[in-house]
């Protein structure tokens, strides 16, 4: 039987195609925005950090309210905020007003997350991990298309702002489509069911688990967000690539992330434990970053762009969220809010740190990301070991119960 929420899911996914473009719009148009705002690269980086603050300011609040009042209002609000950002950012001529519009874009991201992730888990209860990972496919598609769009605009000597207008146009059409779609019922007003008490207790999240998943939300977001913002500049100024070639690194990066999504989604659904992939991908990210820092040559950077896209931006953040949401079966919006609040702290703090590092050396930025990835691997290892320990405990408990 066809899932009645498939059209809704498709619309939700298209929002993240636009979001993928929105994340990179300012960094890929950095030179033009420096002129528009009368600032330098560090100034643009500070404006980029406003997305993280805006996201953090409302994410937990929006997640809690989406559990209570439903997902649709927050998704529509997020789309409206994003369109305001796309139009408004081009109308300002200083970084203060630009910072306000960046803050609005961060809020838009939070509203979308608070409504979309729980909606997909409720629309596809048998495969929530796959449903969430596919979000990353659309984010990566947007990040793949944007460098091509900007390269075309540069080649045709057209206004850089058309890249913002294209994103706004897609979002507007999708808003009209989603307005007519049906959303799955949310659990906010359901009465508690006594027979679910045992299951709820089994899924209760300990303080240690809560802290580890929340910290992983920060680390995983920081690892790939830093690369997505500075990969082009690293290729140009450290590896000695041309501007047009350095921009294409982001397309290579997104090809890697797309391939990872299409490989990971069936693996999680059928054979491999999510925690295994969490540990594996985080470890490979660390090795890739360490290698490119030691050997920042033309071909190494190209290979690095593909590998780091595969391992850090191919759905590992969504895997972490799905694992955490399993600990909050009746409060998925709350889990999303907590997890992505940590991630939004990363999108706020990382640009501030890298703005300082960029004034010294762009190479230092990748060394900094290498250290983050190393911590991420240790954390993923901790999560994986605790998860397997709990799985063995529950299996033993089930085997002993019939004989009790």
UniProtKB/Swiss-Prot annotation:
It comes from the Bacteria. Residues 27-43, 106-132, 179-206, 268-273, 318-336, 386-404 are cytoplasmic. The gene is ydiM. Keywords: Cell inner membrane, Cell membrane, Membrane, Transmembrane, Transmembrane helix, Transport. GO terms for molecular function: transmembrane transporter activity. Residues 1-5, 65-84, 154-157, 228-246, 295-296, 358-364 are periplasmic. PANTHER family: BYPASS OF STOP CODON PROTEIN 6 (PTHR23514:SF3). This is Inner membrane transport protein YdiM. It is a multi-pass membrane protein. Belongs to the major facilitator superfamily. The keyword Cell membrane applies.
């Amino acid at each position: 039987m066809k899932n009645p929420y498939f059209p809704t899911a498709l619309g939700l996914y298209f929002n993240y195609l636009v979001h993928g473009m929105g994340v990179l719009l300012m960094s890929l148009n950095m030179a033009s925005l420096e002129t528009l705002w009368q600032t330098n690269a560090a100034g643009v980086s500070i404006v980029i950090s406003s997305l993280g603050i805006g996201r953090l300011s409302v994410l937990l609040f929006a997640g809690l309210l989406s559990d209570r009042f439903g997902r649709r209002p927050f998704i529509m609000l997020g789309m409206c905020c994003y369109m305001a950002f796309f139009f408004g950012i081009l109308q300002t001529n200083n970084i203060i007003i630009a910072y306000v519009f960046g803050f609005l874009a961060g809020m838009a991201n939070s509203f979308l997350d608070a409504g979309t992730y729980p909606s997909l888990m409720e629309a596809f209860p048998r495969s929530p991990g796959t449903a969430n990972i596919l979000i990353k496919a659309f984010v990566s598609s947007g990040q793949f298309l944007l460098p091509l769009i900007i390269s075309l605009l540069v080649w045709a000597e057209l206004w850089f702002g058309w890249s913002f207008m294209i994103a706004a146009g897609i979002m507007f059409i999708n808003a009209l489509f989603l307005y007519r779609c049906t959303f799955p019922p949310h659990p906010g007003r359901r009465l508690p069911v006594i027979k679910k008490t045992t299951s709820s207790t089994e899924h209760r999240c300990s303080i240690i688990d809560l802290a580890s998943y929340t910290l992983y939300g920060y680390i995983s977001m920081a690892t790939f967000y830093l690369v997505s913002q500075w990969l082009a500049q690293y290729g140009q100024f450290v590896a000695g690539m041309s501007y047009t070639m350095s921009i294409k690194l982001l397309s290579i990066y997104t090809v890697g992330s797309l391939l990872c999504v299409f490989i990971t989604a069936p693996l999680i659904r059928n054979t491999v434990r999510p925690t295994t992939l969490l540990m594996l991908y985080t470890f490979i990210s660390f090795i890739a970053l360490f290698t490119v820092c030691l050997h920042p040559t033309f071909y190494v950077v190209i290979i690095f762009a593909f590998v780091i896209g595969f391992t850090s931006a191919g759905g590992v953040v969504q895997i972490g969220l799905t694992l955490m949401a399993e600990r909050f079966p009746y409060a998925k919006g709350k889990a999303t809010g907590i997890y992505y609040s940590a991630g939004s702290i990363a999108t706020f703090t990382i640009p501030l740190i890298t703005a300082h590092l960029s004034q010294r050396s762009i190479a230092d930025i990748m060394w900094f990301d290498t250290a983050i990835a190393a911590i991420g691997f240790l954390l993923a290892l901790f999560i994986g070991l605790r998860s397997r320990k709990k799985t063995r405990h529950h299996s033993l408990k089930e085997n002993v119960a019939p004989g009790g």
